[in-house]
A protein has these predicted regions:
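Short beta-strand element of the alpha/beta-hydrolase
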Residues: 86-94
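An N-terminal hydrophobic leader/cap segment in hydrolases
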Residues: 10-67
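Alpha/beta-hydrolase active-site loop
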Residues: 134-158
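Serine-hydrolase catalytic core
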Residues: 67, 75-78, 225-322
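The serine-hydrolase catalytic nucleophile loop
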Residues: 95-108, 268
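Hydrolase active-site cap/lid region
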Residues: 181-235, 267
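Alpha/beta-hydrolase fold nucleophile elbow
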Residues: 159-173
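Conserved alpha/beta-hydrolase
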Residues: 110-129
Length: 323
């Protein structure tokens, strides 16, 4: 009996340091993966309003605006003013992109509808962002509600409110999570065009890790999910599923889009169509080729077709005729 106890103690002394080392290594790797993916590689603007304005009179009217987020951080975006009392639409880009990726859509949407259009850089994105990290749709949802408040405070030259009562949001990938979450907080968000919607923030970060670190992608993505708990323990990382959030959005107009170019989000977007309440006005097109996820690399014809689908949706859903 004494020999058995001594043997157990010896094994414990031998294995305990190994176990501790493994736990520390896993924790360190998990937090490192989250830290790296939460700081996106900076992407230069594809085009700026100054350059775009040389080709488009409407594009020349884009202004660079700043406002304050709910947490006191600074936000920025390009703004195209529409007609007085017309709806406004916010365009939210995907992870790793920036506001220039939605500039062309924003200008065409404004031209076709005379809606006010806001194209923000989501936190951690764009050139020299004031907040250098992303929370994969969590803080970004609060930022979107701050953007809505910014729109509400816009005035005409005569000091009347510029934007009408209804708001629409276009969200791509990470932007779609922010859009859904913001809509749950603000009933004035009447229309949502959502493309390549992740199941939740965990699946968003898993996809990002697999893309940036494809070696052992299944293992690294699981490590990253573990790392979100200590890394964002005081942050606004949200773990609710897009389906659970969608269940609260009664009476909204929704356009769901996805495609084969982003299969990791095609299935989750298709399943999301079953989550909205029965009184939602829902349209789903999940077999696009390509979806908005890679539309930036598509031909001019395909790009125009995609943009027109989004424009037609908002024009019908928000009910404001072009002026």
């Amino acid at each position: 009996m004494a020999k058995s106890i001594r043997l157990i103690k010896s094994l414990t002394r031998l294995l305990l340091p190994v176990v501790v080392l493994l736990v520390v290594a896993v924790a360190g790797a998990s937090i490192w993966l989250v830290h790296e993916t939460a700081h996106p590689v900076s992407a230069a603007y594809l085009v700026t309003p100054e350059v775009y304005g040389m080709l488009s009179a409407r594009g020349a009217q884009v202004t660079d605006e700043k406002w304050v987020n709910k947490d006191g951080t600074s936000a920025r975006g390009w703004l195209l003013r529409g007609s007085q009392d017309a709806p406004a639409v916010i365009l939210l880009h995907k992870y790793g992109a920036n506001r220039s990726y939605v500039l062309n859509l924003g200008v065409k949407l404004n031209e076709a509808t005379n809606f006010t259009v806001l194209m923000p850089d989501q936190r951690g994105h764009g050139q020299n962002p004031s907040v250098d990290y992303t929370s994969f749709g969590g803080c970004e949802a609060d930022d979107t509600t701050a953007a809505i408040e910014f729109l509400r405070n816009l005035k005409t030259p005569e000091q009347f409110s510029l934007v009408g009562k209804d708001i629409g949001i276009y969200g791509l990938e990470m932007g779609s999570l922010a859009a859904i979450a913001a809509a749950t907080k603000d009933p004035s968000v009447k229309a949502l065009a959502l493309d390549s919607v992740p199941q939740n923030a965990d699946s968003m970060i898993a996809s990002t890790v697999e893309s940036r670190y494809p070696f052992g992608s299944v293992v690294t993505s699981e490590f990253a999910k573990l790392g979100t708990r200590p890394y964002f323990y005081q942050g606004c990382y949200r773990r609710e599923s897009s389906c659970d959030m969608a269940k609260t959005l009664a009476g909204r107009s929704v356009l769901l889009m996805a495609g084969l170019d982003a299969p990791q989000f095609q299935d989750s977007t298709s399943k999301l169509s079953k989550c909205f309440p029965s009184n939602s006005m829902l349209e789903a097109k999940t077999d696009l080729s390509p979806s908005g996820y890679s539309i930036i690399n598509a031909s001019l014809e395909l790009s125009e077709s995609y943009d027109q689908r989004v424009i037609d949706f908002f024009r019908l859903a928000l009910g404001q005729p072009a002026i």
